[in-house]
Amino acid sequence: MKLNKEKFLKSELGGNLQECVTAWDLWLTELRKFNIDAVGQKYRETRKAADWCQAQWEVFQTVMRQFYNIEYHFSRTDEYFGVCTEDETDWLFKVEREV
């Protein structure tokens, strides 16, 4: 099956994938605020949310591989985050951060 990115991202599945990846990026950003040895309730809740998003992403990743034969990855830097191929030549979507 050929992937029409624009159409896919407007679908329920595509919208949910974007929502999941955006939330994962947010939770990972929140995790950076904690010390390496953090153990409090707020840390546990944040870690759990980030882990949940990662698990959901892995399901989306499998769907993309199974239906479209494309191996997408989550990519994030200080400048952007998004979903792309390993070599970052093909982006499903990319969000530039405001600096």
Go through the PLM ranges and name each one:
Residues 2-28:
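Short, charge/polar-rich alpha-helical segments
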Residues 20-95:
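Acidic, low-complexity, intrinsically disordered interaction modules
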